[in-house]
Amino acid sequence: MNILADESIDRQIVERLRQDGYEVLYIAEMEPSITDEVVLERANEISALLVTADKDFGELVFREGRLSTGGVVLIRLIGLSSTRKGEIVVDAFRKHGADFPNCFSVISPGRIRIRRKI
């Protein structure tokens, strides 16, 4: 699974995913400060699952009909430490990672929502 992490994602989350064996491309390392539209284009170019903490991607996907071919995972873990966020995200990927592609998913404390077929 190709994963593209938006720069809104804490570096600790990216590192934890990498430590767990996931190949993660990180916008902050590649092309910092690009627009959300360009991030979505980059994800589509490589059919990557886009991981973001930016709710604007929900608007791009649902209101404007701009799809991410690999799917989107929105991380809503406000107020938690970066270490705890990393643990929650890796646990979610271990349990539900196979369900994330081609869906719009939200990871929040104690809950994972997966909206099929975006």
Segments (PLM) and residue ranges:
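Histidine- and aromatic-rich ligand-binding microenvironments
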Residues: 31-45, 54, 73, 77-86
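N-terminal first-folded block
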Residues: 2-48
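Mid-chain, well-packed structural core segment of small domains
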Residues: 58-92
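Acidic, metal-binding active-site segment of PIN/NYN-like and related structure-specific nucleases
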Residues: 43-63
